[in-house]
Amino acid sequence: MIQFGPEIDRGLFERTLDFAEQQVARLIEKHPGYYPVYTKNGKWKHDGPAWTHWCDGFLPGLMWIFHRRKAESGAQDGFWMEKAIEYTRPLAPRQFDRDVHDLGFIFLSSYYRWYQATRDPKLNEVLIQAGKTLSLRFMEKGQYLRSFVSEDSLFIDIMMNVGIIFYAARETGDRRLRDIAIRHALTTRRYLVRGDGSTAHEGIFDLETGAFLRHSTQQGWRADSCWSRGLTWALYGFGSCYEYTRDPRFLDTAERCADYYLTHTNGDGVPPWDFQAPEDSRKLADTSAAAIAASGLLRLCRMLPDPVKGFYYWSSALHILRTLCEKYTARDDPQWEGILKGGVYHMHKNLGVNESVMWGDYFFCEALENAMRHTLSNQARKGNGGR
C-alpha cells in the first residue's frame, strides 16, 4: 500500500468544505425540493434541458458527504442526515428506469452513501435493482450498454455508470451481471480509448452486425477530438472497473487516460473543455473535469503497484484541488449560488458555460473528502507502527 505524505493543506480544504456546506444549505433553503443541474449567471436554473435528469443524485450526495464529515469529526449531526434522506428517498422509482444510462450517477452518489451510513438492507435492494435495470440496456451485438440517444450509440460517460452493475453482481453473485459489465468496459476500451490515452465521446455501431462504424460526439469539439470531461469519466470509470475486477487491462486504461490528462493539461491542472478545440475556444476551462480527475486520481493512486507513480498521481490530485480551492470557488462572490465556478455543461448548446454544474460541485467535495481521509488513515498507520 502506498504511504501518502502529509503535504496536504488541511486548513484550505476544511475551509472549502465549510463554504460548500454553506452553499448547499443556502441552495435547499432558497430552492426547496429542487435538484439543479447548472447555474445561469451564478443562479441555479429552474428551466432548460435536464435530459435524463442524470444529476439528481449529486445534491443528496453532497449532503451525505457533509453528514459523514460531521460524524467522523465526532460532531452530532441531525441536519445533514435528515436533509440527505429527504432528498434521496424520492429517487427510489428511478431504480426501474430503463430509459437512461445514468443509474450509476444517480444511485452511487445517493443511495450507496445512505447504505454506507446505515447498512439498511432495504437500501441495498434499491442499489441491486438499479444495477439489474441498467444491465437491460446491453446490446449483445456490439457488446455495449446503449446510450440514451439511440440503440446504436455508446457513450464514454457510461463508464461512470457500469460500476452499479458490478456492485449488483458482487452483492448477488450473479455472474451474468458481472459479465455484462466486463464486456461493456472492454468494448469501450477497444473503441473509445485511443492509443495515446485520449478518448472519443461516442461510438456508433451497426445494429445488424454489431460492428463498430465510427466515432461521433454530442459534446466534444469534433468526433476525433478529446472532450476533457469525457476523458475524466474514463479515468475514473476504468479505475472503478479495476477495483471490482483486478483485471490489469482496466488499470492500464485508467493509467493511460490519467497520463494523457496530466500531460496535456495546463500547469494549474485545470483542462480546456476540449483538448483539440480552436485556440480561442480552448481558453475556456472546465473545472468539473478537473474535479472528476482529482477524485479519480485519488482512487487510482491507491491501486498502483508502483509507489512512485502512485505518489505522482496523489500529488497531482492535490495540486488540482489546491488550484480549484484557491482560484475557482465562489467564496468571494456572495451572489453566486454554486460552489465551484468555471464548469461547462454543453458548449455547443451554450448551456452552463463558465458556470457551476452540480456534478462539478459533487466530485470536487468528494475529492476533498477523500484527500483528507487518506491523510488521516496514513497518520493512523504511522501511529500503529506503520501497519
Language-model features: where?
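Glycan-recognition and catalytic cores of secretory/periplasmic carbohydrate-active enzymes
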Residues: 1-387
